[in-house]
Regions:
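His/Asp/Glu-enriched, well-ordered alpha-helical/loop segment
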Residues: 388-398, 402-428, 432-433, 438, ...
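Flexible loop residues that form catalytic
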Residues: 115, 172, 284, 433-434, ...
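Acidic (Asp/Glu)-rich catalytic clusters
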Residues: 298, 336-340, 445-446
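N-terminal export signals
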Residues: 2, 8-30
Length: 647
């Protein structure tokens, strides 16, 4: 007879949920009587904390709602009504914490795809973007037309009084804000350097003084490869993709130590204010010195969340294009690079197919209405080499994909792998999920894939893309989550910040309403229900990075990670979900109220120093390496530029 698993044990406990990890199956019913019985041993019985709430939304189908939760040693020990939990406690000492008596406890939010370095630098610039942002300098409202963008940019330039410093702004998008080049910027700001960073993070525009300040001239351009030169215009002050990556070699002073440190600290506060207790960056760094520098800010015990990283499989494949054993060894080598609250997830890697949706560089079967072409971030042959080798070694593979043509490449590789070496519960994850047909979704489901989607694409882009590049029919199918649910696939949400604000409830709102920035509803048939959307930021998000046994639901045995809400999401209208107020979080039993949002002049000192020496070592060892991987490439180039500036 097989021993019962945790789910079976819990189902035997009727209406009261308690931890069962220490129970012997043969004495199950005799021993499940109280918390004291469970904890009884020769060691002193620890004191429990019992949190009482107006409502506890557990995200556990075995007990969807509760009134009280007991926590011992940072983990959930019991769940039920207050009377049930008190009865279970018996003689074990406990304290009742009524901090949340009039609030709602929910399973801690899981944000499984963010980019802290890019977020730090964008949020510390002058943000003028196509959507509203909370940045270091305060709230920045959306700008979605050329006239208003010009007005906002002129006002920001006029307020830039220190002419010796470079003005940096992020958020410009040519499909919304009209043309931009060196000549226009020279007219707007003839007497100080200006750098405009595109919303996609893949392009920059510089005025003449900025080009001169950073030494970007004909001599520097002569060192560009043909492909780099083809994606650069010195006359226009415009650098994109590979051209941008070369430009960043000269822009290290933009990412000053103060900007980096303040930006990283801001992301800590931003994630916390959004109710996040677990976050992850797929495609983590491939240099330990750089990881150490990030750990210096993120690893301290006082940080209000745990931050995970997933190795960048495309980098490993690029480094060892004909040596699978060396590629796999490189993937293993990063696993010990975490520290404290930062750590790498084992047996997981991120790969890439096509280009970014914000730049309309995804690979689309029917192309673009204006005739431009998409791009491959990993060419299909290199992608196949990496995918099949990681698959054969039982890796959980996360794949950046946005276009339906890229989806075919992804699914062809998955089917080939399943026919060669069938695996079950492989959880191959389709990341971003910009466009896919119903047939592709059903095929993905039949092959055992899961989806990690960014539903904010619909909010930010669907309205505009109806008119530019994509057209109304395909735009209405952007991020087709109803198809995913109908196919029986598990889905999770992510922001990919700074591609969207790291606000899980805003992602829920986007998925449930599919409301565009223009106020319309795009593809109403692809809206999903609230239950499914909330799972996508809790238990299913945890499942997507194989942490569902630790986080994602209020379940005995898991970490006591909670998001504290002022109101239940089930009690507000769908259109109000994004505005749901977050009181704070609980991390492993530690109560963490949200503090007053910081501003540029109120940056709190970091409790740990940002590691600058590791960044210098990173610069020395990463000159001239290959850049092909979208945001990952920009992150590496920026980090190298920072390091050179600090050397």
């Amino acid at each position: 007879m097989h021993a019962p698993n945790r789910r079976q044990i819990l189902s035997l406990l009727s209406s009261v949920s308690i931890g069962a990890a220490v129970l012997r199956p043969e004495r199950l019913f005799a021993q499940v009587t109280s918390l004291q019985d469970i904890a009884a041993s020769s060691f002193p019985t620890p004191r429990a904390t019992v949190f009482v709430a107006k409502e506890i939304i557990t995200m556990d189908p075995g007990r969807p709602r509760a009134e009280a939760v007991a926590v011992i040693g940072g983990r959930i020990a019991a769940l039920g009504t207050l009377a049930e939990v008190q009865a279970l406690a018996g003689d074990q000492p406990y304290d009742i914490d009524e901090t949340f008596r009039d609030k709602v406890i929910m399973a801690g939010f899981v944000e499984q795809h963010v980019h802290p370095v890019l977020s730090s630098l964008t949020m510390s610039s002058e943000v003028i973007s196509i959507e509203p942002w909370d940045s270091i300098s305060g709230f920045s409202d959306q700008v979605r037309d050329e006239v208003t963008y010009q007005e906002r940019l002129k006002a920001a330039l006029a307020a830039h009084t220190d002419k010796a410093t470079t003005f940096l702004s992020w958020g410009y998008h040519h499909y919304f804000h009209g043309p931009l080049d060196r000549t226009i910027l020279d007219q707007l700001a003839p007497d100080f350097p200006v750098v405009i960073w595109h919303r996609s993070c893949h392009e920059m525009f510089l005025n003449s003084l900025a080009l001169r300040q950073f030494g970007v001239d004909e001599a520097f351009m002569a060192t560009f490869t043909p492909s780099e030169a083809g994606q650069s215009s010195l006359a226009g002050g415009h650098f994109f993709e590979q051209g941008l990556l070369r430009l960043l070699e000269r822009l290290g002073s933009l990412a000053s130590p103060a900007r980096m440190k303040g930006g990283l600290e801001f992301t800590v506060d931003f994630y916390h204010r959004s109710g996040i207790t677990t976050c992850c960056e797929p495609g983590g760094f491939v240099d330990k010195s750089l990881q150490d520098a990030i750990n210096a800010v993120y690893s301290g015990d006082q940080i209000p969340f745990n931050h995970y990283f997933i190795g960048d499989g495309s980098r490993f494949a690029t480094a060892h294009p004909a040596d699978p054993a060396a590629m796999l060894a490189m993937a293993e080598s990063v696993l010990g690079w975490g520290s404290g609250r930062t750590r790498y997830l084992p047996q997981q890697v991120k790969l890439f197919t096509d280009g970014a949706i914000f730049s309309q560089l995804m690979q689309m079967k029917d192309g673009y209405t204006d005739g431009h072409d998409g791009e491959w971030l990993m060419d299909p042959a290199r992608f196949g080499y990496a995918f099949q080798n990681f698959w054969d070694n039982d890796y959980h593979i996360h794949i950046h994909n946005n276009g339906d043509l890229g989806m075919d490449v992804l699914l062809d590789n998955l089917e080939q792998a399943m026919r060669r070496k069938p695996r079950f519960d492989h959880r191959m994850t389709i990341v971003h999920f910009g466009f896919a047909s119903t047939e592709q979704v059903n095929r993905a489901a039949s092959l055992g894939a899961i989806v990690s989607a960014n539903p904010y694409y619909v909010t930010a882009l669907a309205g505009r893309y109806e008119d530019v590049g994509i057209g109304p029919e395909r735009s209405a199918r952007m991020v087709p989550l109803a198809d995913v649910k109908a196919a029986g696939m598990r889905m999770s949400f992510h922001s990919d910040m700074p591609m969207a604000p790291a606000k899980p409830m805003q992602l829920v709102w986007s998925a449930v309403t599919r409301t565009t920035a223009e106020g319309d509803v795009s593809g109403p048939d692809q809206r999903i229900d609230l239950d499914t959307a909330l799972k996508a930021i809790t238990i299913d998000a945890a499942h997507s990075i194989r942490l569902e046994n630790e986080v994602g639901s209020v379940t005995p045995g898991k970490l006591a990670n909670f998001t504290i809400l002022e109101q239940s999401p089930y009690d507000v209208a769908p259109e109000d979900l994004a505005a749901l107020q977050i009181w704070g979080t609980v991390l492993e039993g530690r109560v963490q109220p949200v503090l007053t949002p910081i501003t540029r002049t109120e940056l709190r000192p970091s409790p740990m120093p940002l590691g600058m020496a590791p960044l210098r070592r990173f610069a020395e060892t990463h000159e001239g390496h290959d850049h092909t991987d979208s945001c990952a490439a920009v992150r590496y180039a920026l980090s190298a530029a920072v390091a050179r500036n600090l050397a």
